[in-house]
């Protein structure tokens, strides 16, 4: 599946983007660099089972073991001490990145209830796109019986695009369903 999207990018997306933005060199064409999946776990400080469940879910979704992010400073208002687990994240590159992106746009996003497309304004000004997902059940790897609680995640797609317009064109050519 990863090869399918990568060959599509090389054979179809690159010529379209070169024509659209009048690039002189093939290396000027924007491409995907990495995808990071992040999940903040507020309840992980009190509940070790939720941390373990989240680690397993993200590992299934990403195909790679996530790393636990820990609190840098103690915050009394949130009942957090320094070094406590506060979230998990995984960074996907190369083939795993293309495989995840393919599953995200073709399988997961269409399974969202009342889905009309992703927000085209969620770019950061430098061609990178961020997307928040409210539940993990949209991925086919997660079964309804195996989850104890609905948890969302943040997906950031980092590209070599220098402007939002280039980043939007890249993701649109790759198949990202933007809302009109």
Curated annotation (Swiss-Prot):
* One GO CC term, this protein: ribosome
Check the record and name the Gene3D superfamilies matching this protein.
3.30.1440.10
Query: Keywords in UniProt for this one?
Result: Ribonucleoprotein, Ribosomal protein, RNA-binding, rRNA-binding, tRNA-binding
Which pairs of positions does the record mark as disulfide bonds?
A: none
Q: Does the keyword DNA-binding apply?
A: no
Q: Which InterPro entries match?
A: Ribosomal_uL5, Ribosomal_uL5_bac-type, Ribosomal_uL5_C, Ribosomal_uL5_CS, Ribosomal_uL5_dom_sf, Ribosomal_uL5_N
Cross-referenced Pfam families: Ribosomal_L5 (PF00281), Ribosomal_L5_C (PF00673)
Q: Which domain of life is it from?
A: Bacteria
Question: Oligomeric state and partners?
Answer: Part of the 50S ribosomal subunit; part of the 5S rRNA/L5/L18/L25 subcomplex. Contacts the 5S rRNA and the P site tRNA. Forms a bridge to the 30S subunit in the 70S ribosome.
- What is the recorded function of this protein according to its Swiss-Prot or TrEMBL entry? This is one of the proteins that bind and probably mediate the attachment of the 5S RNA into the large ribosomal subunit, where it forms part of the central protuberance. In the 70S ribosome it contacts protein S13 of the 30S subunit (bridge B1b), connecting the 2 subunits; this bridge is implicated in subunit movement. Contacts the P site tRNA; the 5S rRNA and some of its associated proteins might help stabilize positioning of ribosome-bound tRNAs.
Q: Which family does it belong to?
A: Belongs to the universal ribosomal protein uL5 family.
Q: What is this protein called?
A: Large ribosomal subunit protein uL5
The taxonomic lineage of its organism, from the top, reads: Bacteria, Bacillati, Cyanobacteriota, Cyanophyceae, Gomontiellales
